[in-house]
Amino acid sequence: MTEQEKIRREKLEELKKLGVNPYPAELFPINNFSIDLIEDYKENSKVTIAGRIMSRRIQGNASFAEIQDSKGRIQVYFNRDEICKDNDKSKYNIIYKKLLDIGDIIGINGRMFKTKVGEITVLVKDFKILNKSLRPLPLPKVDSDGNEYDSFSDLEQRYRHRYLDLILNSQVKDIFVKRTKIINTIRNFLNKKSYLEVETPILQPIPGGASARPFITHHNALDIPLYLRISDELFLKKLIVGGLEAVYEFSRDFRNEGMDKNHNPEFTILELYVAYKDYFWMMDLTESLIEKVCIELNGKTKIQYDSKLIDFKAPYEKISMFDAIKKFTGYDISRMDENELRKICNDMSIEVDESMGEGKLIDAIFGSKCEKKFINPTFIIDYPKSMSPLTKQHRSNPNLTERFELFINGMEIANAYSELNDPIDQLERFENQLELGKKGDDEAMFIDMDFIKSLEYGMPPTSGIGIGLDRLIMLMTNQTSIQEVLFFPQMKPLRNEPVISNDAKIVLNKLQKKGECDFNIFKSEFDFSNKKWDKLTKELRVKDLISISKNENNLLIKPS
């Protein structure tokens, strides 16, 4: 426990001794939010707000503070004689001045006014402690010139402690507000067409509907293995068989695979299935939907993403899988067998292995040489049958399927088919997947005989699509990492880090960013006394977190 944490716990006990409950149970009747008070300012109006103290400037019998609520921040003014009308001034002198800290949450009753410099402010008539915080916020430091240091910007810390990220970085909350708006826009778009939102199982006896490595668990009562779903496709198609002609689900799916800036093992996808439609119809619906989302969120169809300008105005370009590969590699692979595909992969230095069949080899070529080329929305259409075990055979070419994927900024955003509804063909495709599994492909699909049985009762011609919502949200909010659009992305386990003081952490964090440097120059960047500095460096050396050495001219310090 740090010195600051000890002091806050002592203050907590002092509050209790004074009869103040630092964690009251009863509701606090908020009727105002910061941004509304600023945008609709009314002189001398009564207000009731609540929020977190983010800064304080105590000036004797008066004090300015900044309160942050869910909408923003507003300045508040504490005056001892306004708060303490009788001779007992302890509420201001003791509770406010000595026992409250930055980070504490309080409720305020007051009136609106403007300061001499015109800043909209709440004059505090009374306040109530709603939560005493026991850890200090890692607030940035600002020098006399207004330069900010030690901001809460380390990605590891931000993702691991999202609650602090939301408190300290207001723009982060904006991303997640937009995320909700995007999902609501999609839901409203589909509901207006009278499509039915449904729910299907997350725990499944067979992980079907996609080629991916699943997470496996065990049901103790039934003594059977179960899988976290990799897709809800097969269950949704069973609903189409049952006569629900247009169904969709916002589903949480799980794939036991790698993590990078575009992949998280737990992710959100929209899956939609509509009877009596085909993949051409689904392309039209998809571009209408995504254009609608862009306009609702940004007011226009063109947006800046990273350094690129992307136009979501429909219609979108279309190019076949084989034509795209020929365009960017020079190879016509449309009639190549598995051995020929493996050879050209080697010729182009594309990493492959013996478990990869024809479909995965083609996918490797496209992924390595083509997909990053598509910046504006582009439909890649007409995939080989070997890549698409759940897709209907192409109406004019039996070697292809009626499938498209939507690529934007080099990322796959959507995957759609004219759905395979021939049960005999579907079983043969599943059996081919089984053979790939025997060769070592751990992403090959399982055979789902109940799904085959449902198709044998008859599924109408159907088109289906899955849209990766996390990636779509990345694009719409100009974020280049999927972790930025997930409240709590999956993180690597923490190492057992040694316990050190907050000041030692500040020194270590700064040193880790700088690397090896001159000891005395580095020391001059802090305001610590010589005694304090010696104590901190000793603390870090004992924990083997830094090392200090000497060359011919200088004393050097570096992180271990």
Cite the ranges covered by each PLM segment.
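A short, conserved structural fragment
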Residues: 541-551
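Short amphipathic alpha-helical interaction segments
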Residues: 528-542
